[in-house]
């Protein structure tokens, strides 16, 4: 299977990458079938050979996740929702909903406690007034 992946080159700690088409079993920095572009993560510079990339995708080449993101930014692929993103967002939404319910419950309990305390104070003041009028 042909993969579209990034091939690292450049100095230590100053990596740049070439977008290459290669066999999925070959090494990351091995000889590619074809060089399709360039990506520098420091400067965010990206150069893509759009015709060659479309040709490789038409032949069934599978891009890696990072390459897919670059191609989506370049307008060569439509943005797709990946299953892991869907699951993560669903978990986050469920957590937010549970937190909101918990906060609402705590607020209701605090309001009820405040109302009970106010009622107790009112009873205490009423009983104090009645004792003072009796005596």
From Swiss-Prot:
Gene3D superfamilies reported for this sequence: 3.30.1320.10
PANTHER family reported in the protein's UniProt record: 30S RIBOSOMAL PROTEIN S16 (PTHR12919), SMALL RIBOSOMAL SUBUNIT PROTEIN BS16M (PTHR12919:SF20)
GTP-binding in keyword set: no
Record-stated family: Belongs to the bacterial ribosomal protein bS16 family.
One Gene Ontology biological process: translation
Keywords annotated in UniProt: Ribonucleoprotein, Ribosomal protein
InterPro entries: Ribosomal_bS16, Ribosomal_bS16_CS, Ribosomal_bS16_dom_sf
GO MF terms held by the record: structural constituent of ribosome
Signal sequence extent: none
Name of the protein described by the UniProt record: Small ribosomal subunit protein bS16
Basic and acidic residues compositional bias, start-end: 94-121
The keyword Transmembrane belongs to this UniProt entry's keyword annotation: no
Cystine residue pairs: none
Region annotation Disordered: where it falls in the sequence: 82-135
Gene name linked to the record: rpsP
Bias type Acidic residues, positions: 123-135
Cellular component annotations (GO), alphabetically ordered: cytoplasm; small ribosomal subunit
């Amino acid at each position: 299977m042909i993969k579209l992946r990034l091939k690292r080159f450049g100095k230590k700690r100053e990596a740049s990458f070439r977008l290459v088409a290669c066999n999925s079993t070959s090494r990351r920095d091995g000889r590619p079938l074809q060089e399709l572009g360039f990506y520098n993560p420091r400067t965010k510079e990206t150069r893509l050979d759009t015709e060659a990339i479309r040709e490789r995708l038409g032949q069934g080449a599978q891009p890696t996740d990072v390459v897919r993101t670059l191609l989506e930014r370049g307008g060569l692929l439509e943005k797709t929702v990946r299953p892991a993103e869907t699951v993560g967002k669903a978990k986050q939404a469920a957590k937010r909903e549970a937190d909101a319910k918990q906060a609402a419950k705590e607020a209701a309990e605090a309001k009820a406690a405040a109302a009970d305390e106010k009622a107790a104070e009112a009873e205490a003041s009423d009983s104090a007034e009645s004792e003072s009028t009796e005596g």
